[in-house]
Amino acid sequence: MKPFAIFSTNRWNRIRYTLYAPGYDILGRIFSKSRSRSIQGLGICPGDEVLIIGAGTGLDLEFIPMNCHITATDITSAMIAQTMRKNTLLKRNLKAEVMDGQHLNFPDSSVDKIILHLILAVIPDPVVCLKECERVLKPGGQIAVFDKFVPKGRTLSLLRKILNPITNLLFSNINRSFETIVSEISLLTESDVPADFNGNFRIIRLRK
């Protein structure tokens, strides 16, 4: 096993995000503007089947229209509990369940829109996750990605290489390249724009 590989496993994700769940919203809300912008780009229609992978505490729910069907999934039951609690006020048409984003319990071509916010830099294998998304998406379906990636066209700095074991321990990998990930799938990149922290976070929209 590679050094620090344990920090990129579902087991470790369950441990740390169970611990973070009670206070996650304190920091999570700093990305509200980008979450909203990303979801608006999907153009969710009435009756759409919307899947959130890595829903966390449900911070995306308030930006999703009332008249669609939402399934929120997360690897930890503590996060799902927070999502359900939040929805008692938001009153979205919501089903929430514990699920691994690398193994989706959905039939082929059954989902209209997928939201992947701050998950591709955390999930052990982002390529497997996107391939699963591609499988369950209906033809023409879209994916909203908001996450931290190495900025397009830049090489890894020494500082990022040094910091990554620490960030990977605490919350996520900061050295993943979206271009490398997307090169292994057949989804079309419709848009890719810089977002928070000087473009280290990006808002990306994919289509099947």
What are these regions, as identified by a protein language model?
Residues M1-C45, L59-D60, Q82, K86, ...:
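Conserved class I S-adenosyl-L-methionine
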Residues K113-D125:
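A short SAM/SAH-binding and catalytic strip from SAM-dependent methyltransferases
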Residues F4-W12, L27, A144-I203:
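C-terminal alpha-helical "lid/dimerization" subdomain adjacent to the S-adenosyl-L-methionine
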Residues E49-H103:
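Class I SAM-dependent methyltransferase SAM/SAH-binding core
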Residues G47, L137-I143:
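Short glycine-dipeptide loop
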Residues V127-P139:
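A short glycine-rich, Lys/Arg-flanked "PGG" loop and its adjoining helix->strand segment in the class I
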Residues Q102-I114:
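A short acidic, Gly/Pro-enriched loop at the edge of an enzyme's catalytic core
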